[in-house]
Structure formats: structure tokens, C-alpha cells
Amino acid sequence: VRSSAASDVYKRQNENETEAALADLEAEQDALWAEAQRLSDQLVAQQAANGQSTESNPGGYIWPVNSRYITSTMGGRNSPGGIGSTNHKGTDIGRVGYTSPVYAAKAGTVIISAYNKYRGNYVVVSHGSGNTTTYQHLSSRSVSVGTYVAQGQVVGITGTTGVSSGPHLHFEITENGQIINPLKYLTDYIKGW
């Protein structure tokens, strides 16, 4: 009986620690998203002050990797392997391995190229007017802050850095500061879930 009670206490403690870690992860993700949005807004203001266009690329989005295999969609989900957020803010594209190029889904300016313990290596590209794309869990980044990238230009290489259950690309789109489901635009995909 004593070992069962101790086991229950240990189990509850682990569950509490896991819940606290997930809450920290979600708070960190929200803070990073807010920082990306702030930088995007700052870039738009600078471009407007310099007389540059702040319009988004009207050409639409392209697939950021060659794979079309979706392993997790945006929104509520069971966290794979018990890691990561259950309120998924993007779309995970799998079957990419560790060496696939990641392409800018739209032309724009790199506002973040960094490493974070949750997102791993990641890149955020501003397309103007509060529109951004985010590429996470990269094994390496090919661009730096301030770089203008053309649509289809390589911004990094796929990987599994940060909180990740295996090699994939976590891809996010924001429009006018609101998170948008990437599958609204990237419609020719294979369901992997």
C-alpha cells in the first residue's frame, strides 16, 4: 500500500510538472508570436516612412517544402509524444528528413532568424501589412535578419530542433496580425493523421 501511495504521489507530481511545462511552452510561444508581430509592424512602418510599398505579395503562397504530407493541422490536438502545445498554431509537414530545403512561401523581409528551445532554429518572414510566415524546427537557417527573400528562396533546411517529435516543418501564416490555417491556401496535401 505504501509503494502504491508513493507511486500515485510521484505520478501526480510528474503530471503537474508536465502541465506546468506545457503552460510555459504556450506562454513562450505567445510571447514569440507577439514579438514577431511587433517586428513586422515596425518593418511596415519603416517601409512606409521610406516610401516603400507595404503591400503583400499578390502571387499567393507556395509550399514551403517539397513534401505535401501533413502530420498535424492547426488548432486543438493531442500533443504528439506528450510534447509540444495542444493548441497548435500552425501546420506540421512531415516526410521531409533532415536535409530538405525550406522555401520562402512568399517574398518578404526576414525579421527573425534565431534559435529558441521550443521552436528550435526558426525563421520569420514579414510580407508587409501584418502578414508573416514562420518556419520552425530547422536543422539550419540560411538567412539573417534584414535579408529580403524572394518567393521560393531557401530560408533553411528541415530538421527536428527544439520541441519536436521528429523531422518536420512547422509552418505558420499570419494575416493582418491573425493566425491563419496554412491549409486555407495549400490545398493539395496528403492527410497523415
Regions found by a protein language model. Name each.
Residues 1-58:
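Alpha-helical oligomerization segments with coiled-coil/rod-like character
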Residues 57-193:
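Catalytic cores of peptidoglycan-degrading enzymes
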